[in-house]
Amino acid sequence: MCERTPLNPGHVGSLLNFAPPDSLYFSNLRGNGSHIPGLHQLPYNRRDVCTLPWTSTSNSCTPGPPAPPQTRAFGGYCPPFFPNSGFLNSSSSGGHVKTHLEESRCFPGTNHKTEEAGRQDEVYAGEHGGAGDRGYSDVDRSHGSAAQLDPDSALHVNGTKLDQNPIHGSSSQTCNRSTLAEGAPWCCSQVKTRKKRKPYSKPQLAELENEFLMNEFINRQKRKELSDRLDLSDQQVKIWFQNRRMKKKRLMMREQAFSVY
């Protein structure tokens, strides 16, 4: 059960008849641990061999320092199982290439990860950059097509605008005139026109003064008679009497003020 080899005297072999683990990592070693004639020897020492995960628990080996960078496979991971170990002894070049392939497949390095991340970034940037370029090109193309209009159509549009402006100006002038003259409600004017005040004539004022001296307050029937006789409206007669009463009141207040002083 305990198998001693020139490399590791304290190595404990497996219960099954598998190939020694040293032959899985060193292509120039035979199954029994001896070197193949005609091949160069790998530079390793007993401390490197004792850093294997299945030999680290051996009592005869002392735990050594961490493995060098070139032995990435000795990091505690179990190597792949080869049922037929004959290809390891066939040729050094073939075994070396296959070992490196298995190693790169089982234990991908950081460089491989960074390369894959860089490729993904390039693909992402390519896709989105292309989409962005396409979007900008579409926008530029649309702006260019909008800018390159037919000159005839532009002249036609300008001509219609120029033709419409005189019509609009004449219509606005007409609207202003009608608003000032007639007070048409359909024209939207800010200043609401007021009906021109029609002054009272001297005969009308004389008749109204006589009626006021007789009676300051008149009823509706009397107002109607005055409006018909003087050719005035009821509103005009009513307003005149109101103003005349206020005038009389002011005169009385002024007389009282003068009498005090």
From Swiss-Prot:
Q: Where is the composition biased (Basic and acidic residues)?
A: 112-122
Its annotated compartments are: Nucleus
DNA-binding region as annotated in the record: 193-252
> Could you tell me which SUPFAM superfamilies the record lists for this protein?
Homeodomain-like
Tell me the CDD domains matching this sequence.
Answer: homeodomain
Q: Where is it chiefly localized? A: nucleus
- Write out the entry's keywords from A to Z: Developmental protein, DNA-binding, Homeobox, Nucleus, Transcription, Transcription regulation
- Where does the source fall among the domains of life? Eukaryota
Give a single Pfam family match: Homeodomain
Enumerate the residue ranges of region (Disordered). Answer: 106-158
SMART domains, sorted: HOX (SM00389)
Q: What does this protein do?
A: Sequence-specific transcription factor which is part of a developmental regulatory system that provides cells with specific positional identities on the anterior-posterior axis.
Assigned protein family? Belongs to the Abd-B homeobox family.
Name of the molecule in the record: Homeobox protein Hox-D12a
Q: Which organism is it from?
A: Takifugu rubripes (Japanese pufferfish)
